[in-house]
């Protein structure tokens, strides 16, 4: 998980935290990987927000796991409230894992991508969506996500629950605004 295309950053106006921390590693990965890097960035992860409603539902299925999740996400709930006034937290890495397991969760487009390694835009991903640079496409930039599919898969695994029960519950619950 890392990077962003059109989304604002989460540690600077233009950079996602992982790429901001080590922009040289991110740049080298895009440059030397030898295949298209599939960028699960903030553009898709911002659509996956764990809310108090999710936690309440989860506690009814698996209270022990939910207590743990509540404890480890408290910092992120506080962060997103302080900086973005969101009551909930964006759970970036679970979406990357879900996409790795089931590529139908996200979709996007191929492009040449580079990473800014110094200056005010440190860590920003520069995505050449319109082929201005005429360079080989070294990435797939994920821009669309199916939140329903993500939540079905994520909650089924995390809560050790039956998928058909989770699917039915999600149809009847209002977990998102």
Give the location of each predicted region:
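A broad, low-specificity signal for short, low-complexity segments enriched in glycine/proline
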Residues: 1-2, 59
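Residue-level marker of positions within ordered structural domains that often coincide
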Residues: 3, 34, 102
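Active-site glycine-rich loop that binds ribose-phosphate moieties when present
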Residues: 2-28
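A structural motif corresponding to the C-terminal end of an alpha-helix
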Residues: 28-37
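Conformational coupling and interaction surfaces
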Residues: 20-24, 37-177
């Amino acid at each position: 998980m890392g990077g962003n295309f059109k989304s604002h950053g989460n540690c600077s106006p233009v950079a996602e935290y992982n790429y901001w921390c080590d922009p040289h590693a991110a740049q080298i990965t895009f440059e030397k990987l030898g295949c298209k890097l599939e960028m699960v960035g903030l553009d898709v992860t911002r659509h996956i927000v764990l809310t108090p409603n999710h936690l309440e539902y989860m506690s009814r299925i698996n209270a022990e796991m939910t207590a743990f999740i509540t404890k480890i996400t408290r910092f992120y709930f506080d962060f997103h409230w302080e900086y973005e006034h969101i009551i909930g937290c964006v759970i970036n890495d679970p979406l990357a894992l879900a996409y790795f397991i089931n590529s139908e969760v996200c979709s996007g487009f191929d492009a040449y991508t580079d990473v800014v390694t110094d200056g005010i835009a440190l860590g920003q991903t520069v995505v050449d969506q319109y082929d201005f640079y005429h360079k080989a496409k070294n990435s797939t930039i994920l821009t669309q996500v199916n939140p329903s599919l993500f939540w079905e898969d994520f909650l089924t695994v995390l809560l050790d629950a039956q998928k058909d029960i989770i699917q039915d519950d999600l149809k009847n619950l209002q977990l998102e605004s």
